[in-house]
Protein backbone atom coordinates (compact mmCIF):
# COMPACT_ATOMS: atom_id res chain seq x y z
CA UNK A 1 0.00 0.00 0.00
CA UNK A 2 2.75 2.45 0.93
CA UNK A 3 4.41 2.26 -2.51
CA UNK A 4 1.08 2.98 -4.20
CA UNK A 5 0.40 5.85 -1.82
CA UNK A 6 3.78 7.37 -2.77
CA UNK A 7 3.03 6.86 -6.47
CA UNK A 8 -0.44 8.42 -6.22
CA UNK A 9 0.92 11.34 -4.20
CA UNK A 10 3.57 11.99 -6.84
CA UNK A 11 1.10 11.96 -9.76
CA UNK A 12 -2.04 13.25 -7.96
CA UNK A 13 -4.57 11.56 -10.30
CA UNK A 14 -8.29 12.30 -10.04
CA UNK A 15 -9.08 8.63 -10.56
CA UNK A 16 -7.21 5.34 -10.61
CA UNK A 17 -8.41 2.88 -13.23
CA UNK A 18 -7.39 -0.50 -11.87
CA UNK A 19 -6.77 -2.95 -14.72
CA UNK A 20 -4.52 -5.22 -12.66
CA UNK A 21 -5.34 -8.78 -11.64
CA UNK A 22 -8.10 -8.93 -9.03
CA UNK A 23 -5.67 -9.88 -6.26
CA UNK A 24 -4.59 -6.23 -6.08
CA UNK A 25 -8.05 -4.65 -5.76
CA UNK A 26 -8.11 -4.13 -1.99
CA UNK A 27 -4.55 -2.81 -1.87
CA UNK A 28 -5.31 -0.28 -4.61
CA UNK A 29 -8.60 0.73 -2.99
CA UNK A 30 -6.80 1.31 0.32
CA UNK A 31 -4.16 3.48 -1.39
CA UNK A 32 -6.91 5.49 -3.09
CA UNK A 33 -8.59 6.12 0.27
CA UNK A 34 -5.33 7.24 1.87
CA UNK A 35 -4.61 9.69 -0.96
CA UNK A 36 -8.12 10.98 -1.73
CA UNK A 37 -8.33 9.43 -5.20
CA UNK A 38 -11.44 8.00 -6.88
CA UNK A 39 -11.35 4.34 -7.93
CA UNK A 40 -12.62 2.23 -10.85
CA UNK A 41 -11.97 -1.44 -11.61
CA UNK A 42 -12.94 -4.09 -14.13
CA UNK A 43 -13.12 -7.23 -11.99
CA UNK A 44 -14.01 -7.98 -8.38
CA UNK A 45 -11.56 -8.94 -5.68
CA UNK A 46 -10.31 -12.50 -5.41
CA UNK A 47 -7.75 -13.79 -2.89
CA UNK A 48 -4.54 -14.96 -4.55
CA UNK A 49 -4.47 -18.25 -2.65
CA UNK A 50 -8.12 -19.23 -3.18
CA UNK A 51 -10.27 -19.44 -6.33
CA UNK A 52 -13.19 -17.55 -4.84
CA UNK A 53 -14.55 -14.16 -5.79
CA UNK A 54 -17.30 -12.00 -4.37
CA UNK A 55 -17.93 -8.29 -4.06
CA UNK A 56 -18.45 -8.30 -0.27
CA UNK A 57 -14.76 -7.57 0.36
CA UNK A 58 -14.96 -4.45 -1.79
CA UNK A 59 -18.46 -3.42 -0.67
CA UNK A 60 -16.99 -3.24 2.85
CA UNK A 61 -15.15 -0.10 1.64
CA UNK A 62 -18.38 1.70 0.67
CA UNK A 63 -18.81 3.76 3.86
CA UNK A 64 -15.15 4.77 3.93
CA UNK A 65 -15.27 6.00 0.32
CA UNK A 66 -18.52 7.89 0.96
CA UNK A 67 -17.17 9.47 4.16
CA UNK A 68 -14.07 10.60 2.22
CA UNK A 69 -16.25 12.07 -0.55
CA UNK A 70 -14.79 9.62 -3.05
CA UNK A 71 -16.33 7.36 -5.66
CA UNK A 72 -15.47 3.70 -6.15
CA UNK A 73 -16.99 2.07 -9.23
CA UNK A 74 -16.63 -1.70 -9.36
CA UNK A 75 -16.89 -4.16 -12.25
CA UNK A 76 -16.62 -1.81 -15.23
CA UNK A 77 -15.06 -4.23 -17.68
CA UNK A 78 -17.03 -6.10 -20.29
CA UNK A 79 -18.39 -8.86 -18.10
CA UNK A 80 -19.30 -7.53 -15.64
CA UNK A 81 -19.75 -3.98 -16.81
CA UNK A 82 -21.06 -3.75 -20.34
CA UNK A 83 -23.27 -6.80 -19.73
CA UNK A 84 -24.91 -4.98 -16.82
CA UNK A 85 -25.48 -1.88 -18.95
CA UNK A 86 -27.05 -3.99 -21.73
CA UNK A 87 -29.27 -5.76 -19.20
CA UNK A 88 -30.43 -2.50 -17.60
CA UNK A 89 -31.06 -0.92 -21.02
CA UNK A 90 -33.11 -3.91 -22.18
CA UNK A 91 -35.11 -3.95 -18.94
CA UNK A 92 -35.84 -0.22 -19.19
CA UNK A 93 -36.53 0.14 -22.91
CA UNK A 94 -37.62 -3.23 -24.28
CA UNK A 95 -39.35 -5.35 -21.63
CA UNK A 96 -42.09 -4.91 -19.06
CA UNK A 97 -40.84 -8.00 -17.22
CA UNK A 98 -37.82 -10.28 -17.46
CA UNK A 99 -38.29 -13.81 -16.18
CA UNK A 100 -35.19 -15.44 -17.62
CA UNK A 101 -31.82 -14.05 -18.59
CA UNK A 102 -28.73 -15.77 -19.96
CA UNK A 103 -25.53 -13.78 -20.31
CA UNK A 104 -23.35 -15.65 -22.76
CA UNK A 105 -19.73 -15.13 -23.72
CA UNK A 106 -17.84 -16.72 -26.58
CA UNK A 107 -14.11 -16.73 -27.11
CA UNK A 108 -13.94 -17.60 -30.80
CA UNK A 109 -10.24 -16.93 -31.27
CA UNK A 110 -7.64 -19.58 -30.64
CA UNK A 111 -4.58 -17.93 -32.21
CA UNK A 112 -3.84 -21.37 -33.68
CA UNK A 113 -3.09 -22.66 -30.19
CA UNK A 114 -4.62 -25.57 -28.29
CA UNK A 115 -5.29 -23.28 -25.31
CA UNK A 116 -6.12 -19.60 -25.78
CA UNK A 117 -8.01 -17.33 -23.40
CA UNK A 118 -9.60 -13.93 -23.72
CA UNK A 119 -8.29 -12.83 -20.33
CA UNK A 120 -5.51 -13.76 -17.95
CA UNK A 121 -5.06 -17.56 -18.27
CA UNK A 122 -4.75 -18.14 -14.52
CA UNK A 123 -7.98 -16.26 -13.83
CA UNK A 124 -9.76 -18.13 -16.64
CA UNK A 125 -8.67 -21.48 -15.20
CA UNK A 126 -9.84 -20.42 -11.75
CA UNK A 127 -13.22 -19.40 -13.23
CA UNK A 128 -13.84 -22.66 -15.07
CA UNK A 129 -12.89 -24.82 -12.09
CA UNK A 130 -15.34 -23.14 -9.70
CA UNK A 131 -18.81 -24.52 -9.14
CA UNK A 132 -21.49 -23.13 -11.44
CA UNK A 133 -24.24 -21.05 -9.87
CA UNK A 134 -27.60 -19.77 -11.04
CA UNK A 135 -30.90 -18.47 -9.63
CA UNK A 136 -34.06 -20.43 -10.34
CA UNK A 137 -37.50 -20.59 -8.73
CA UNK A 138 -36.50 -18.15 -5.99
CA UNK A 139 -33.33 -19.90 -4.88
CA UNK A 140 -29.65 -20.20 -5.71
CA UNK A 141 -28.56 -23.50 -7.21
CA UNK A 142 -25.04 -24.85 -7.75
CA UNK A 143 -23.57 -27.29 -10.24
CA UNK A 144 -20.30 -29.12 -10.59
CA UNK A 145 -17.78 -27.20 -12.75
CA UNK A 146 -18.58 -27.38 -16.49
CA UNK A 147 -21.33 -29.97 -15.93
CA UNK A 148 -24.14 -27.91 -17.50
CA UNK A 149 -23.59 -27.00 -21.14
CA UNK A 150 -25.27 -26.65 -24.49
CA UNK A 151 -24.38 -25.61 -28.00
CA UNK A 152 -25.24 -22.01 -28.84
CA UNK A 153 -25.13 -20.45 -32.28
CA UNK A 154 -23.25 -17.15 -31.95
CA UNK A 155 -23.68 -14.50 -34.67
CA UNK A 156 -20.58 -14.19 -36.88
CA UNK A 157 -18.94 -17.09 -35.03
CA UNK A 158 -21.23 -20.08 -35.42
CA UNK A 159 -22.05 -22.87 -32.99
CA UNK A 160 -19.90 -23.22 -29.88
CA UNK A 161 -20.38 -25.42 -26.85
CA UNK A 162 -21.17 -23.07 -23.94
CA UNK A 163 -20.97 -23.80 -20.22
CA UNK A 164 -22.83 -22.55 -17.17
CA UNK A 165 -20.33 -20.78 -14.94
CA UNK A 166 -20.51 -18.64 -11.85
CA UNK A 167 -19.39 -15.18 -12.87
CA UNK A 168 -19.39 -11.69 -11.42
CA UNK A 169 -22.69 -10.67 -13.04
CA UNK A 170 -24.47 -12.76 -10.42
CA UNK A 171 -22.88 -10.54 -7.79
CA UNK A 172 -23.47 -7.23 -9.55
CA UNK A 173 -26.79 -7.27 -11.44
Region locations from a protein language model:
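Conserved Rossmann-fold cofactor-binding substructure of NAD(P)-dependent oxidoreductases
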Residues: 1-13, 20, 24
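Residue-level detector of anion-binding/catalytic polar loops
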Residues: 14, 38, 71
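Redox-cofactor binding/interface segments in oxidoreductases and associated redox assembly factors
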Residues: 16-18, 41
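Rossmann-fold NAD(P)-binding glycine/threonine-rich loop
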Residues: 42-71
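Adenosine-phosphate binding glycine-rich loop
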Residues: 61-108
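Active-site-lining helix/loop region of Rossmann-like oxidoreductase modules
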Residues: 92-173
Amino acid sequence: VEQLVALFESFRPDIVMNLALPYQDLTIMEACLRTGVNYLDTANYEPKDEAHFEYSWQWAYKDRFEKAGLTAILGCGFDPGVTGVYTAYAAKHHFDEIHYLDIVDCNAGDHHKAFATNFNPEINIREITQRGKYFEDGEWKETDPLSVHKALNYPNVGPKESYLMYHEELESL
